[in-house]
């Protein structure tokens, strides 16, 4: 929450005061610069606010600021560094293989949503995203240790910047030093409060499901050919994928692949990301956010079942 406040206030204030830089940024790129921002940053780590400032097209804000940031942006800047540094070594290969499944299906859903939103030059704007997915897949399978180091450094830089920006926000709030504007500080207070309510509600909902539907969960897990821990992990991921991390080592192999694949797009769909998106955008964007993330997450799960079935047949 601290880093969210820092990024939101400082990044928007900076962009407000440097609009000429943003206007010239597109002159050096063959694609919309918001695509690059959305592919590298989570929505609540500055991704959405930066995209909103640099893009004049409301549909591109939905595409890059809402969808890209909440899928591949969140995966790169938040999920991968945390999981790769906290999972047991034996679980990392299964996790990375699942992430690969999630990355493979993600462009399919994004292209369909882009067509629905009528994004100009969609396939040209998809080039950097496709290249980024290919690079990630290549890094994962060629040199996993180096990939972990690079992503960890990137995530730590984002985290440190977030805390530094929050410190500057605090200085401005008390001493009016001009690092940001007071209206942004008041606005971010409201955003964080709404996020907290939604996250708390989603966690309570998950606990109620686990408490009163444990038998149904066990039966459903048997039908899906995964163990109970894997199914619980999927349910928890709807709120936050971090909640399923302690369960990862207890999952069966297929369950690990499914949870990792789903986390690329489906994680946080009813958690903090939903709270943030609902706070800063309209109901249309929020609806697209939920439908697209769930669709990509479910498609990733189906991809895992398809490939594991073929392996068993071979």
What are the roles of these predicted feature ranges?
Residues 28-55, 200-206, 223-248:
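Hydrophobic alpha-helical transmembrane segments of multi-pass integral membrane proteins
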């Amino acid at each position: 929450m601290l880093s969210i406040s820092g990024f939101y206030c400082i990044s928007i204030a900076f962009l407000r005061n440097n609009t000429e830089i943003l206007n010239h940024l597109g002159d050096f790129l063959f694609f919309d610069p918001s695509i690059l921002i959305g592919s590298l940053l989570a929505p609540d780590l500055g991704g959405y606010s930066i995209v909103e400032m640099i893009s004049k097209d409301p549909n591109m804000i939905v595409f890059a600021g809402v969808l890209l940031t909440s899928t591949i942006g969140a995966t790169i800047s938040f999920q991968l560094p945390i999981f790769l540094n906290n999972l047991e070594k034996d679980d990392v290969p299964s996790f990375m293989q699942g992430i690969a499944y999630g990355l493979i299906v993600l462009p399919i859903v994004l292209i369909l949503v882009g067509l629905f939103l009528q994004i100009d030059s969609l396939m040209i704007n998809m080039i950097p995203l496709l290249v980024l997915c290919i690079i990630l897949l290549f890094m994962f399978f060629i040199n996993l240790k180096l990939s972990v180091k690079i992503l960890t450094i990137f995530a730590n830089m984002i985290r440190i910047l977030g805390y530094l920006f929050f410190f500057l926000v605090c200085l401005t709030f008390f001493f009016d030093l001009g690092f940001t504007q007071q209206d942004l500080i008041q606005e971010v207070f409201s955003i964080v409060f709404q996020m907290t309510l939604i996250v708390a509600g989603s966690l309570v909902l998950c606990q109620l499901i686990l408490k009163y539907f444990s038998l149904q969960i066990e039966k459903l897990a048997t039908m899906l050919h995964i163990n109970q821990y894997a199914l619980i992990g999927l349910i928890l991921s709807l709120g936050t994928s971090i909640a399923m991390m302690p369960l990862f080592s207890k999952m069966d192999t297929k369950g690990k692949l499914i949870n990792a694949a789903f986390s690329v797009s489906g994680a946080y769909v009813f958690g903090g990301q939903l709270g943030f998106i609902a706070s800063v955008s309209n109901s249309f964007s929020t609806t697209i956010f939920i439908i697209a993330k769930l669709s990509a997450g479910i498609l990733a799960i189906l991809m895992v079942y398809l490939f594991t079935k073929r392996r068993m047949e071979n």
